[in-house]
Curated annotation (Swiss-Prot):
Source organism superkingdom: Eukaryota
Gene assigned in the entry: Ppp1r2
Biased composition (Basic and acidic residues): 111-121, 132-143
Family: Belongs to the protein phosphatase inhibitor 2 family.
Name this polypeptide is given: Protein phosphatase inhibitor 2
Amino acid sequence: MAASTASHRPIKGILKNKTSAASPPVVPSAEQPRPIVEEELSKKSQKWDEMNILATYHPADKDYGLMKIDEPNTPYHNMIGDDEDAYSDSEGNEVMTPDILAKKLAAAEGSEPKYRTREQESSGEEDNDLSPEEREKKRQFEMKRKLHYNEGLNIKLARQLISKDLHDDDEDEEMAETADGDSMNVEESSQGSTTSDHLQHKSQSS
């Protein structure tokens, strides 16, 4: 009998239920009137005004921490200058051969880079504001900087001079050897002629 009474009683939880302490014992749902159930549901649940939520939390102008960049794209400028054709690669679909490349390099070698000419133009304007000591320091600095940046050119020139000197030395040695060889040939021929003269004198005298 204890088993049958235990099956009809609801299982009690550890936590106290506020409604169970104040309300009368639980009556099966068939005996309860309907309005009480709706009343309990309205107390426990909330009604959401979805249009109000959309208007409040999702306005059209809200960016949610994301930035919109309204800048135009950075423009790309081709090289601007007088000798654009010397540096441009837009001569049709012309194939770059070593001869053409050598001609272009030779044409570009004599001209000074554009950034250096711009630096020189701008430095002339700045010199007017400096004292004589500062001008002298700046002049020395620029001179040292030019020497440093032109060091590669100086190395090329030094190599050319060294190779030219070596080539000249080789030619001098060859000329000295040929001169020595010629003098030896002259001596041999003169010795040969003297011996032939002696032989002729001997043959005539005998």
